[in-house]
């Protein structure tokens, strides 16, 4: 088939149809890159506009996978399974050790197909796969999505697949905070391989050179930031500051709000429309106004802050404990040596709160559309075996989710005690099916305040109202201050 400009069919649709036919015919190797936009323009003698639209729609429909700086590839999960070859299909984020963990657990005797997607597209990819009836057998997802995916019936309760393993191993050996976040409506819907917390990274050498300690309060944070600014550090303090960083922004912001005693949701309803929220936002805006945080943070991607820290262009970086692996890679050192150069601590305390952190992490889940749910469950069990978790913890610096794995790693891992300490008192992200939309509102709130588009009080109240509408929960109003009349003389 060739493209005919004389036909009354749009060029992009002709190209899209042709590419689908070539994919189905086996023309393209699954491991090799598809032709680039430039190559397709040259081959069919058409402009770039229809080529771009054809590839974009194929990606949106899950036919192809697009990777930044690598190109486009056929999505092997879009193709029909072969009935003569039982295969486990998995989707994991491209960032991190996940694909290697799954392949190692599968072993050489099992057929497995692992698709890696950019982390910020993972939620959309999984929902789209379910909608198309092409969900994987196993996937790694943010554990805060458990309520959404479980309530929608997307994933199995693991008790349905191997209740004994859940009772004998998951509930006994896994860290209690992770057991809790993997549960919904009294059932377990996934297993976390590692524990993560939100906090503050700092450069030990930079603090030491100025004779400073890690900040314990917001006032300390400002003083330390000013000292680094005076010393010529280009961006003394950095943070994920907008929607381009996706969940990383909400993760940081929830921890920062907690440091001033603020919960997004409380037992009575939405708690954001408070003076404490406005105070936290006002402080963050003041850091931008004082030149201690660059306004560019509103456009940062999720991993940009840790890159600036590694390069010495920032001295303090709000983020997650999982970023230790990226720091090790940037420095070119084994992970244990990261702690010789960097420290990780709580978010400093605000005037109305205490030092804070937020628990997070990823979890493996089995989808109800799984072609091989039993095999998928056995794969999941092997992925989180103590020896496997210990091996990846040593290379990545992450904290294993199992006590038995921690015992194997502890002698070689100085990071474990610090992460475990933060985890003990960590707050949680809002636990409800509509969390992704709540997260988007939090990201928009911070971005609006940092850019000056909305004032702190207006942004807090607007976001509280939006989250109230999303969740159906009432917005809790702060009580009016009581004015005591002067006694008559």
Question: Can you say where each PLM-predicted feature lies in the sequence?
Answer:
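Mature extracytoplasmic/periplasmic domains
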Residues: 329-332, 362-436
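Extracytoplasmic/periplasmic solute-binding protein
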Residues: 189, 222-270
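Hinge/lid segment of periplasmic solute-binding proteins
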Residues: 144-197
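C-terminal capping/gating helix-and-loop segments adjacent to ligand/active sites or protein-protein/ligand interfaces
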Residues: 396, 414-471
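Glycine-centered hinge/linker elements that transmit conformational signals in sensory
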Residues: 225, 267-298
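Extracytoplasmic/periplasmic substrate-binding proteins
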Residues: 285-371, 487-488
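Conserved N-terminal structural module of periplasmic/extracytoplasmic solute-binding proteins
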Residues: 43, 47-145, 466-489
């Amino acid at each position: 088939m060739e493209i005919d400009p004389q036909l009354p069919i749009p060029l992009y649709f002709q190209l899209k149809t042709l590419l689908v036919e070539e994919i189905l015919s086996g023309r393209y190797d699954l491991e090799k890159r598809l032709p680039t936009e430039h190559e397709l323009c040259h081959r069919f003698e058409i402009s770039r506009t229809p080529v771009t639209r054809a590839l974009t729609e194929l990606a949106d429909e899950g036919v192809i996978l697009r990777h930044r700086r690598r190109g486009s590839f056929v999505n092997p999960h879009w193709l029909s399974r072969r009935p003569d070859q039982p295969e486990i299909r998995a989707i994991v984020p491209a960032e991190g050790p996940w694909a290697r963990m799954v392949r190692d657990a599968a072993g050489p005797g099992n057929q497995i197909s692992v698709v890696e997607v950019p982390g910020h597209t993972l939620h959309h990819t999984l929902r789209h796969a379910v909608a198309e009836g092409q969900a994987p057998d196993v996937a790694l997802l943010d554990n805060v999505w458990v309520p959404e995916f479980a309530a929608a019936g997307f994933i199995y309760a693991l008790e349905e697949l191997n209740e004994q393993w859940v009772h004998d191993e998951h509930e006994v050996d896994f860290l209690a905070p992770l057991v809790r976040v993997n549960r919904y409506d009294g059932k377990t819907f996934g297993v976390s391989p590692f524990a993560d917390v939100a906090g503050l990274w700092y450069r030990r050498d930079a603090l030491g050179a100025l004779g400073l300690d890690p900040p314990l309060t917001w006032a300390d944070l400002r003083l330390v930031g000013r000292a680094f600014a005076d010393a010529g550090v280009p961006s003394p303090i950095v943070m994920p500051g907008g929607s381009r960083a996706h969940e990383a922004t909400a993760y940081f912001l929830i921890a920062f709000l907690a440091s001033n005693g603020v919960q997004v949701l409380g037992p009575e309803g939405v708690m954001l429309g408070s003076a404490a929220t406005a105070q936290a936002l006002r402080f963050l805006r003041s850091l931008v106004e004082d030149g201690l945080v660059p306004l560019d943070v509103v456009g940062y991607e999720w991993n940009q802050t840790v890159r600036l820290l590694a390069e010495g262009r920032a001295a303090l970086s709000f983020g997650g404990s999982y970023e230790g692996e990226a720091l090790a890679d940037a420095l070119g050192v084994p992970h244990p040596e990261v702690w010789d150069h960097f420290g990780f601590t709580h978010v400093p305390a605000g005037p109305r709160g205490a030092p804070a952190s937020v628990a997070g992490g990823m979890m493996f889940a089995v989808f109800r559309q799984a072609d091989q749910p039993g095999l998928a469950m056995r794969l999941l069990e092997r992925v989180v075996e103590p020896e496997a978790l210990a091996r990846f913890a040593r290379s990545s610096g992450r904290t294993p989710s199992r006590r038995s794995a921690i015992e194997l790693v502890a002698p070689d891992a100085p990071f474990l005690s610090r992460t475990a300490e933060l985890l003990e008192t960590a707050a949680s992200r809002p636990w409800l099916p509509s969390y992704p939309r709540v997260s988007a509102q939090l990201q928009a709130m911070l971005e609006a305040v940092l850019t000056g588009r909305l004032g702190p009080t207006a942004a807090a109240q607007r976001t509280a109202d939006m989250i109230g509408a999303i969740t159906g929960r009432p917005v809790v109003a702060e009580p009016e201050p009581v004015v005591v009349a002067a006694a008559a003389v």
